[in-house]
């Protein structure tokens, strides 16, 4: 697309797709405008992953159909994290109730002027269909190139988002997050 239009691309990746997006951005930074990851294991230490054993086995299982070198993508993305940071905006969306990718593996440290971690509600499988996630992705993609700003929602939606993430931070997440508190 970049070669056809001359415009930079925004890469959005969900789960392992975020690992591929991050890797692509490192390989061709001149073609990439921004990267958005959704519950992606971008900070995994393959030797001591906090992922459950079943999830580790799943990564190994799905790596084979992707090709002989697919298993190396996750460690490479993790190593890339320690090198020079991406020269473009990076928004990492993660959930404390993901169930597949632990929050510490779906977030990144980097340049606070270009990189951010955004907590969202929901499960790993639901991230691609979650209205809050889609709203945030649309917000990130709507920013003009060269004028990136951190996600700081305002208005009624911003208030609702802050209330929701405050509940998550307070530990009121998981299966009961849609039920009223009963005391």
What do the PLM-derived regions correspond to, one by one?
Residues 1-84, 100:
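Serine-dependent carboxylesterase/thioesterase catalytic core
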Residues 86-183:
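C-terminal catalytic-base region of ester-bond hydrolases, centering on the histidine
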